[in-house]
Amino acid sequence: ENGLTEEDISILDSNELKKKEPNLTCHSGLYCTKEASTNYGMLTNAITNLAKKNKINFLLRHNVKYVEETSKDVNMIFSDNSTLTANFVINCAGGNSLDIAKKFRLLKGYSDLHFRGEYWVANSDIADLVKTNIYTVPRYPEFPFLDPHWIKRANGETEIGPNAVPVDSPEAYDSFITDIPTVLSKITDIVTGSTKKLLLNTDFISLVSKEFLS
């Protein structure tokens, strides 16, 4: 489905990997002969333009304040007090998906945690230490999505990351806190919702503290 065959992937020992990447030290690894690096900004713009050609409209900066449901349709009222009426809604709002689901009175027993991934651009003297993407074995098996890797970008830069800085909302791109009400609401969700058990997980607490300091 992703364009790879069994011949494209192999398990190599440390000596075999050393021949391909002299600066890499490991016991063994999965080696893939094919890889891709994507400029996600260009990809997003291309998909957006294609969608617009097919008469799809984008409503930017329209946060959903609340939802009104009738027997026939759904009215979504946005932060600017405009309204969108639909008879079928697909919720694929990324980090805001759970919040929107709750406006439909769904998944009330669930809560979520948000992390911001940050990348470091490697200096020129170390950018070419390896020629390919390197993914490490997760330090915390329960949270394999929070381990950094070595990435060769489409623009030629080499980056190391991401880390996973805990933040209060999906839009906290440059700070830790967007606003106090959001923070208080998130704390309440954590304490009363399904994520409260993470507060007793020593691996999770250790990971969060290290990532915050990074």
Per-region residue spans from a language model:
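Flavin (FAD/FMN) cofactor-binding and adjacent substrate-gating region
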Residues: 1-54, 59-60, 66-72, 177-194
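Contiguous C-terminal substrate-recognition/catalytic subdomains in enzyme active sites
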Residues: 155-158, 163-214
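Flavin (FAD/FMN) cofactor-binding core of flavoprotein oxidoreductases
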Residues: 10, 14-19, 37, 111-116, ...
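Flavin-dependent oxidoreductases
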Residues: 67-179
